[in-house]
Amino acid sequence: MERIIEAISALRAPLQQGEYDLHRLVMDALDTAGLPWEHEVKLAPRCRIDLMCGNVGIEIKRGKVEPARVKEQLRRYAACPQVEALILVTEKTVALPHTIYGKPVRLICLNRLWGIAL
């Protein structure tokens, strides 16, 4: 998980990006780090995560994040046996628990990578 966080934390995304542009930037960062990934992985019925990198699920959110909604989404992902850890990539900070169902959860906040607070 730390190699994935390190790879994603190295990217510097332009401010004006669509969500799928952010997907591409994250995928490119994982490629550069030599980390294999899968895009839009179906974990269960009506449960599709943006990326899986090994057993780590990566969800990418652009714009304003509704904390209750994203936490529920992460709970659905964490309930899936193939997910052993979760990383949420957002433009803005959102409070997250350190674990969900005993699985580690980490936040990568792009505005911190930009060196500004949004």
Q: Where do the language-model regions lie?
A:
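Conserved catalytic cores of phosphodiester-cleaving nucleases, focusing on short active-site segments
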Residues: L51-K64, Y77
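Acidic-basic catalytic patches of nuclease active cores, encompassing PD-(D/E)XK
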Residues: M1-K42
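Class I S-adenosyl-L-methionine-dependent methyltransferase catalytic core
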Residues: Q17, R112-A117
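Short glycine/proline-enriched coil/turn segments at helix->beta-strand junctions
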Residues: D31-L35, C53-V56, C80-E84, G102-P104
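Amphipathic coiled-coil/heptad-repeat helices and related helical stalk/stem segments
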Residues: A44-P45, V70-Q73
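Nucleic-acid nuclease catalytic cores
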Residues: K64, A68-R69, A78-R112
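Catalytic centers of nucleases
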Residues: K42-G54
